Amino acid sequence: MNNDYGRKLELVTFDKGTGLEAVSHYQFYTGTSVVRCWTTLTNKGSEVQTIEYMSSFALTGVEKEGLKKPEDKMKIWVCHNSWQRELQWQDYTLEQVGLASSAKPTEQRSSKVFACTNVGNWSAKEYIPMGVLENTEAGSVLFWQIEQNGSWHWELSDVGGHFYLQLSGPSEIESHWYKNLVPNESIESVKCAVGSVTGSFDKAMDELTKYRRKIRRRNKDNQRLAVIFNDYMNCLWGDPTAEKEFPLVDAAAEAGCEYFCIDAGWYADGFWWDEVGEWKESRKRFPNGVKEVADYIRKKGMIPGLWLEIEVMGIKCPLVDSVCDDSWFFTRHGKRVYDRSRYQLDFRNPKVRSHADEVID
C-alpha cells in the first residue's frame, strides 16, 4: 500500500502452536534508503501466551556480499556514550568482537553474540541506540537506530552459515520485561529504522539524517529555536542564591536569552543532592522567595523556569520518614532501591501521583 510517506509493506505470519499472529511492518520513505520497522503480535489462540522477546527487525545474511571471509571484510561500528563522554564511535572487526570464522561456512553456528543493550529510561547511558555494519569489500553499509527512550537491545551473531542482525526493545533476559498476552490482545514492539547505502560511514549518516528530518513532527521549534540560559552547567553547579541569580539574569537578558532556568539546589539549605523531593524553596537561599527572582526574570523580558526532578526523592528528604512508606518507592527483595543516595518514586501508587500534582499546583 502507499501512504503519505511512501510505500508500506505488512507481512503476516502465524504460529499454529501458540495461536500468535505477527505482523511485520515496513514503512518506506520516499527519497531515502531507510525503512521504519516494527512488529505487532496478536494472540488469536485460546490461552494466555507469555511474550519474553519481540524483535522489531531481523535480517539473516548481512555479510553475504563479496567473496572474502566475513572477518576479512566486515566492520561493526558502535557508538559508546556516557555522562560527559558522548558519541564515541568506534569500529571493530568481527574477530575483535569474538565472531571470527571457526568452522566451514555451512556449519558456522557459534554461541557467541555481540550485543549492545540498555536497561531503563536513560536510553543512552552507555551506548547510543544505533549501529553500523560496513562491508569493506562490497563498499556497502547497513545502519540502524532503535527509536526507544527506554530499554533496548541489538545483537549480531551467526546461525546457519550466515550472520544475522536483530533489533528490539526490552526483553526478559536483558531487561526483565515480559508480557502476558491474553486471547485477542495485541502488543506492538518499539520502532526502529534500518537503511543501506553504497559508500562510507559518513554517507550512511547523511541518509539517516534525511530520514530523521522526514519523521520529525512539525512544531514551532522547526522554524524558531528559543535561546535558553540554565544556571547549572559551568556556572552555579547546584548552589543558587538570590544574590547570585540577579547578576546572571542581567547578563542573560543582555545576551538576548528568552528563557532563564533556575536549576538544582533552590529547595535545600545545605547540600542539595540527597535532600531533593519536597520541592519547597529554601528561605536561606532565597530570603524573599524564589518568586522574587522569577519576577525579576520576567521584568527583564524573559520567561522563568524552575528545575524539577519529580521522579526521585533523596534519602535525607524530610518526607521519606514522615509521610512515605515503602509503597512509594521501587523495591527489590523487599527493600527500597536507592542509587547515589536517592529513591525512585513508583507512580503506580496514587499517593505518589497526588504528591506530584501538589508540587506542580
Language-model segment annotations:
Residues M1-V159, S175:
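Polysaccharide-binding surfaces and accessory modules of carbohydrate-active proteins
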Residues R224-A226, W237-P240, R283, I310-D361:
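Active-site-adjacent "subsite" loops/lids of carbohydrate-active enzymes
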Residues K244-Y267:
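Catalytic domains of carbohydrate-active enzymes, especially glycoside hydrolases
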